[in-house]
């Protein structure tokens, strides 16, 4: 079995795979101060709830956009499971991930994993929209190369900024708005936040298509993907587990090269 972990700025998503099948998935809050011991304490009840024996997991893959947690997670995995995690990057995804980009090393691990999974599933070209703390758009061109994209404030990040700066506007639930014209303050905020995100994404994707000179499938992932995608005019598919799937693919490639895996572990220790 494989443990895949996607460490985001707000949430951390964990999945356990048996071969290509995702057996279990959990979403927990990201706490940037956690030590490896605290992460192990968090993992144990998750495993226990599904009857998973940690030592039965024979591999781990990690994508982290929180540098202070990368080593903590690697240590937690090593001590609890007894394996060295494959840390996703443009380098470890070589062969699955090609980039026509000035500095591939600066591409976030989550963006690499998304691109790997999207290209594997949909071919090239393909566009990924990942709704998280940031709304990321990744563009893979007709050659199969990652060429860049967009990083914008995420829907919840934008909402929190509004709540914190507008004294009379309190926090609301981000439920589906019923109309663009809100009939009270709460409805108006819901319409502005949700439809604003929908139209922002659609507008950016159409600009990307014009720059490319052709259209492509657009796959949405992330915690709010379903809510936005059903109102979108450009999103063509939803894959909530896209990042985890990308981690699985990167791990499978690395697992066939033990020497490379060991080198990666040593260089990041």
Region locations from a protein language model:
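Short glycine-rich, Thr/Ser-proximal phosphate-binding strand/loop in the N-terminal lobe
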Residues: 2-45, 55, 144-171, 175-179
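Short beta-strand-loop/turn "lid" adjacent to the catalytic site in phosphate-handling enzymes
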Residues: 50-107, 143-149, 154-155, 183-194, ...
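Phosphate/pyrophosphate-binding loops at sites that engage ATP/ADP/AMP, CoA/4′-phosphopantetheine
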Residues: 43-59, 205-215
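Glycine-rich phosphate-binding loop of actin/hexokinase-like ATP-binding domains
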Residues: 27, 124-160, 217-218, 236-243
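Extended, charge-rich low-complexity interaction segments
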Residues: 116-129, 133, 264-269
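ATP-binding/phosphotransfer module of carbohydrate and carboxylate kinases, centering on a glycine-rich
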Residues: 2-4, 30, 158-269
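Conserved phosphate-binding catalytic cores of ATP/NTP-utilizing and phosphoryl-transfer enzymes
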Residues: 93-126, 248-255
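Short glycine-aspartate micro-motif
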Residues: 2-6, 59-61, 126-130, 219
């Amino acid at each position: 079995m494989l443990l895949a972990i996607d460490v985001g700025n707000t949430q951390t998503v964990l999945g356990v795979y048996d071969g290509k099948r995702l057996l279990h998935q959990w979403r927990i809050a990201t706490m940037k101060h956690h030590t490896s011991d605290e992460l192990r304490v968090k993992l144990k009840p998750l495993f226990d709830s599904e009857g998973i024996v940690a030592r039965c997991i024979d591999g781990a893959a990690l994508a982290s956009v929180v540098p202070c947690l990368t080593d903590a997670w690697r240590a937690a995995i090593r001590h609890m499971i007894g394996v060295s995690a494959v840390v996703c990057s443009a380098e470890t995804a070589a062969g699955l991930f090609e980039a026509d980009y000035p500095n591939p090393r600066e591409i976030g691990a989550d963006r690499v994993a998304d691109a790997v999974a999207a290209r594997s599933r949909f071919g090239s070209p393909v566009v990924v929209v990942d709704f998280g703390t940031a709304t990321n758009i990744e563009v893979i061109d007709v050659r199969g190369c990652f060429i860049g994209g967009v990083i914008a404030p995420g829907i919840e990040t934008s909402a929190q900024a509004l709540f914190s700066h507008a004294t009379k506007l309190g926090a609301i639930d981000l439920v589906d708005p019923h109309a663009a014209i809100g009939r009270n303050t709460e409805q108006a905020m819901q319409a502005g936040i949700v439809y604003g995100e929908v139209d922002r994404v659609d507008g950016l994707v159409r600009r990307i298509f014009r720059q490319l000179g052709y259209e492509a499938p657009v796959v949405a992932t992330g915690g709010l993907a379903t809510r936005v995608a059903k109102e979108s005019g450009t999103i063509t598919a939803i894959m909530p587990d896209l990042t985890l799937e990308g981690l699985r693919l990167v791990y499978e490639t690395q697992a066939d090269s033990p020497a490379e895996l060991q080198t990666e572990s040593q260089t990041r220790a």
